[in-house]
C-alpha cells in the first residue's frame, strides 16, 4: 500500500481520536491536564497495546514525533473551540471515528502480518489498534466502553484483521477497498442502529416479578378515625 496515502489516513485518525478524547474529558469537566491525557491516550493507546502484544518495542512511539505534535495541537484546538463549533463537530464525529477505526485497524493488522504472526494475532492487533485507545479513554472517564456496548464497532476491525491475516488483500487497491468497507459498514451501524445480540440479567418491569407481600399492620378505617376525632372534640 502507498505509504503516503496510508499516512493521510493515520493523520485523520489521529486528529479524530485526539479530539474525541478531549471532548469526553471536557464533558466530564476535567482540567486542561485531564483533557490532554485523555486526548493522547485515545490517539495512541491502541497502538501501544498492539506493540506490547505483537512484540514491537513500545519506544517506537517516540519516533512518531510529528503525530504526537499533531495530537497535541488537536487537543489544544478542541479545548479552545466555541461550544457551537463543538456541537457541530460531534454531529460528524462518527464519520471521523470510523475513518480512524479503519485506518488503525488495517495498520495494526499489517504490522502483525508482516512480522509473520498467526491470524489470531493479526486479528487481535487490528482490534486493539482500532479500539484500544477508546476503551482506555472511557475507563479513565468512568464510563462503560461504548465500543463494547454501542452499535457494532469492534466487529469491523476484527473483519479487517481476518481478511488481511488470511492473505486475501495483498494489493494497494485491495487494502483501500477494505478501508472503504470498514468505514461504510461502521456508518451503517450508526445510522441503522445495528447491534449485536445481548442479554440482560436484570429482569424487565413487565417480566415475572414476585408480588410484594401485603402489610400485616392493620390500617385504621374511616369510622375509627372519625370516632377518635369526635372524642378529641
Enumerate the predicted regions with their spans:
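Cytoplasmic-side transmembrane-helix entry/capping segments in multi-pass membrane proteins
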Residues: 33-41, 63-68, 89-100, 125, ...
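C-terminal ends of transmembrane helices
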Residues: 18-28, 51, 76-90, 135-145, ...
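Structural signature of hydrophobic alpha-helical transmembrane segments
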Residues: 2-14, 40, 59-73, 117-130
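Short, structured motif recognition centered on aromatic/hydrophobic residues
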Residues: 37-41, 48-54, 124, 128, ...
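Ordered, amphipathic secondary-structure segments that act as subunit-interaction surfaces
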Residues: 72-111
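N-terminal topogenic module of multi-pass integral membrane proteins
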Residues: 1-44, 48-59
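Helix-coil boundary and interhelical linker segments in multi-pass alpha-helical membrane proteins
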Residues: 1-5, 52-62, 107-121, 165-174
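Intrinsically disordered, low-complexity non-transmembrane regions of multi-pass membrane transporters
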Residues: 1, 194-233
